[in-house]
Structures are given as structure tokens and as C-alpha cells.
């Protein structure tokens, strides 16, 4: 290339740079299709919950309602401030659902007091409230006050919002026809988020409370700043921080007292038992699509426990399970074709959104005919294929035991008393890292990382 052309390139880039920076943002498709309303919906005990509602401009026919309840804020706030997408996925963009987002009690713009994984209310008190009654009261208000709705409601949510779906599907409102608890918290001690069979999830919990701050004294749309730790090196930071008790001061104000509750209740006591949803998952009326990911380090337990419990305790429920090769919520962020260096041969998340999730809601909320969903749709890693089953766990499944042997081997045969063994030293001053990434965040792809760097220590 001639020298004069090379010299022109920086000049051209300098001229075009400001123009590119000033380029207008693409039109928001939601503003063209929806009108936004913000309302306070009264609950039976007088508390009002802030709800942001997107109403289709098409009034030629009635539309079903999709509801998400969340502790993370329903922003952007203001009736002239619109999301850039509504509903569970982009596949819903042209489906004209009425979509409602609600701040749960004590979070952001809603009134009341926030309680983590709120236990069930006291029976017999008509004014007592819990997440199921709040869901009932919200649905009742929506179907009675929103124009052009067809009287059918669905719910969806991932992680904590998925927990609110699992609680909400117990509300018994006749308009609630279909729900999708996705990576739901079902039992925070047994295997979701807080503890894994009694093992406190330090990095996950501490990182969560760095951003899950207490709000102001009154309802507010403001999102508090994330608490800064001053370093990207989480391994070094936790090593120097010392015992868990020493971390309390760093998150005490931010966590609304939840951190103290977590570390005070280290056994499966009444605190955790009251938050276990499994005993309550009975006689569930709406159709259920439970979704989870095999590589979900936070709530893998919840999805499987939800599906299994519905099978055992609510057999009449039209219940379906989808388990894909995903990290926490990955089916709703990206195409699901890979995690780190692990590739799955197809766009698994895009397929789920278009061919499973959308048809599920369209069938139960719009009466659209669709293929019958199998009881379980499960991705088999290694062979990289979807498999379907008429029961979960599959009827043909058999338990298989693995045994650790010496020299880093694994076997299907129980070792004898005289077989060799390997010994390891557990040194709290030199803990084994789970990832090579220099990061303070909980690394989602660590399950597929090459762990030989740690095994060589």
C-alpha cells in the first residue's frame, strides 16, 4: 500500500471517531410496540407493591399477562423510561404479551419489609401475607384492572425471581395458568446459594452482598453503589481477610442483617427448614416448566429438587423439566453454544427460547397448538445431544457408584482394605484455588477449566 494511503488512515479514523461516538442509539422496539404504566398494587395487609406494566398498543384482541416479581429492581423507573426488551427472551418481542414487573416487599419502590426467602404465613390469619398471597393479590388486581387482557397469567424468573415463581405457583389464583421457575432457590441450606449440604458458600455469599444492598428508609428507585474491595485478586483477598467472622463488618449494613442470619444458622435448624419449599409443593395448579443448567454453581439443586418434588408430591401437575449445558441463567444470556473452552455443538439456549419456552407459554396462555413437551428434556454432555424422558428421574436409571483409588485413579469397583491410597494435606493457610482467573467474582466457567494447575501443588 502506498505510504500516502497509510498516512491517511489515522486522519480518517480521527475524523470518523467523533461521528461514530455521536451516532444515535437505535430506536427502542419496545416503545414502538408498548405503552408503559407504573402503579402501586395494594396487598391484603395494606402494603403497596410497585409494579411496572408494559401494555401492547394493539387493542384489537385480548392479550395474556406475564408477571415477574424481583428483589433486583424493575427499572428503568419512570413511565417515559422503557426497557429495551420485555418478557423472558427476544423470542417474545412480537408476541404482544402484557408484561408486568414488580418490586417485592421492601425492595426499591415497594413498601413493606424485605424478608429473605420469606417463610409461609401463619395459617388462619386473613391479613397475614407471604409471597404466595402477594402473588395472588397482584394477579387479582392485574386481571381486574388492565384493559384488553384475556384473563390468563403466566410467571417466569431466574434465580431469586425463580424462587418467587416457585412461591407464587402455590397461590391458587385461577387465572395463573403457566409458570416457569428457572434456577429457583428451593432450599438455601441443602444445595442452593447459601450452603451446599452445610458447606457455607463464602465467595458466592460475600460477593452477592457486595451489591445486594439495603435500600433507603423509604421506597426509592436508587440503586446503591457496589461495595468496593480494592483488588481484583479474590484468592489473595480472602486469604488475607481471615476467618468468616471478620468479614461481617464489611457487609453488615449492606446485607440488611441477612449475612448475620446465614452465619449464625450453620445447621439445618428451624430457620432453614421454614425456607425449604419442598414440603409446600403440593397440589400445584398451573402448568410448570422448570429450567436449570448442569454447570450452575448456585442453583443446580433447586431446579432438580423442584421437578422431583412436583413428581412425588403433586403428581397431577402438568410439570416439565429442561436441563441444559448452562451456567447460572446462561439460557437467557447468549446462545448457549459453549462455556469457556467446552463446546456443545449447537446454539442450545436459542433453541430452548424459541422451541420450548415460547411454545410453552403460547400454548397455555394463548391456546396455541404446539408439540407436546416430554416430561424431561435433558442435554447429554459429551455426546452433545438433547434427550427426552417420560419421567424424571428416568425410570431406567440405575445408581452407579464411583470409587477413588491411589495414583489419581477412579474405579467402579469398591477397593479392598489392602489397596494403596493417596494422602492430601488440607492447609487453611494455603487453600486450593478453583480457578486460574485473577478475579474477585465467582467464576462461572470454572467447572470446565483444566484443573491440573491445582492438582500439581
For the regions a protein language model found, what residue spans apply to each?
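Short glycine-enriched nucleophile-adjacent loop
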Residues: 143, 160-173
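Active-site-adjacent alpha-helix of alpha/beta-hydrolase-fold enzymes
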Residues: 300-319
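C-terminal, loop-rich substrate-recognition/catalytic regions characterized by aromatic stacking residues
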Residues: 229-245, 322, 331, 336-457
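Short beta-strand/loop motif that positions the catalytic acidic residue
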Residues: 284, 290-292
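Alpha/beta-hydrolase fold nucleophile elbow
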Residues: 147-159
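Cap/lid segment of the alpha/beta-hydrolase catalytic domain
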Residues: 60-145, 193-194, 200, 333-344
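Accessory cap/linker subdomain of secreted extracellular hydrolases
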Residues: 75, 82-85, 94, 116-128, ...
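N-terminal cap/lid segment of alpha/beta-hydrolase-fold proteins
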Residues: 24-61
Amino acid at each position: 500500500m502506498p505510504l500516502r494511503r497509510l498516512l491517511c488512515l489515522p486522519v480518517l479514523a480521527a475524523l470518523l471517531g467523533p461521528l461514530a461516538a455521536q451516532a444515535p442509539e437505535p430506536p427502542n422496539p419496545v416503545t414502538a410496540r408498548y405503552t408503559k404504566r407504573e402503579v402501586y398494587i395494594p396487598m391484603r395487609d395494606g402494603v403497596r407493591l410497585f409494579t411496572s406494566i408494559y401494555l401492547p398498543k394493539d387493542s384489537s384482541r385480548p392479550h395474556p399477562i406475564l408477571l415477574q416479581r424481583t428483589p433486583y429492581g424493575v427499572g428503568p423507573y419512570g413511565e417515559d423510561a422503557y426497557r429495551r426488551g420485555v418478557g423472558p427472551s427476544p423470542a417474545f418481542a412480537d408476541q404482544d404479551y402484557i408484561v408486568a414487573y414488580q418490586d417485592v416487599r421492601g425492595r426499591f419502590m415497594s413498601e413493606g419489609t424485605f424478608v429473605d426467602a420469606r417463610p409461609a404465613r401463619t395459617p388462619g390469619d386473613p391479613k397475614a401475607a407471604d409471597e404466595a398471597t402477594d402473588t395472588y393479590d397482584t394477579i387479582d388486581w392485574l386481571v381486574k384492572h388492565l384493559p384488553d387482557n384475556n384473563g390468563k397469567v403466566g410467571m417466569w424468573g431466574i434465580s431469586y425471581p425463580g424462587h418467587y415463581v416457585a412461591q407464587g405457583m402455590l397461590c391458587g389464583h385461577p387465572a395463573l395458568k403457566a409458570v416457569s421457575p428457572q434456577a429457583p432457590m428451593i432450599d438455601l441450606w441443602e444445595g442452593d446459594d447459601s450452603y451446599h449440604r452445610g458447606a457455607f458458600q463464602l465467595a458466592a455469599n460475600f460477593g452477592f452482598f457486595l451489591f445486594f444492598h439495603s435500600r433507603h428508609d423509604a421506597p426509592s428507585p436508587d440503586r446503591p453503589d457496589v461495595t468496593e474491595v480494592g483488588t481484583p485478586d479474590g484468592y489473595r483477598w480472602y486469604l488475607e481477610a481471615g476467618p468468616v467472622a471478620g468479614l461481617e463488618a464489611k457487609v453488615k449494613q449492606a446485607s440488611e442483617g441477612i449475612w448475620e442470619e446465614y452465619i449464625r444458622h450453620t445447621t439445618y435448624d428451624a430457620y432453614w427448614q421454614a425456607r425449604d419449599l419442598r414440603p409446600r409443593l403440593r397440589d400445584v395448579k398451573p402448568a410448570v416448566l422448570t429450567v436449570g443448567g448442569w454447570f450452575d454453581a448456585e442453583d443446580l439443586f433447586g431446579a432438580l429438587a423442584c421437578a422431583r418434588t412436583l413428581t412425588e408430591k403433586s403428581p397431577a401437575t402438568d410439570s416439565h423439566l429442561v436441563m441444559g449445558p448452562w451456567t447460572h441463567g446462561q439460557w437467557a444470556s447468549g446462545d448457549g453454544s459453549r462455556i469457556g473452552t467446552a463446546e456443545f455443538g449447537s446454539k442450545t439456549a436459542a433453541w430452548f427460547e424459541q422451541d420450548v419456552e415460547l411454545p410453552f407459554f403460547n400454548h397455555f396462555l394463548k391456546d396455541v397448538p404446539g408439540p407436546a413437551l416430554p416430561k424431561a428434556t435433558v442435554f447429554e454432555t459429551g455426546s452433545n445431544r438433547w434427550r427426552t424422558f417420560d419421567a424424571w428421574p428416568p425410570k431406567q436409571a440405575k445408581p452407579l457408584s464411583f470409587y477413588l483409588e491411589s495414583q489419581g485413579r477412579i474405579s467402579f469397583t469398591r477397593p479392598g482394605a489392602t489397596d494403596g491410597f493417596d494422602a492430601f494435606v488440607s492447609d487453611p493457610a494455603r487453600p486450593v484455588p478453583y480457578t486460574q482467573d485473577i478475579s474477585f467474582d465467582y467464576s462461572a466457567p470454572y467447572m470446565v477449566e483444566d484443573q491440573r494447575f491445582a492438582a500439581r501443588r
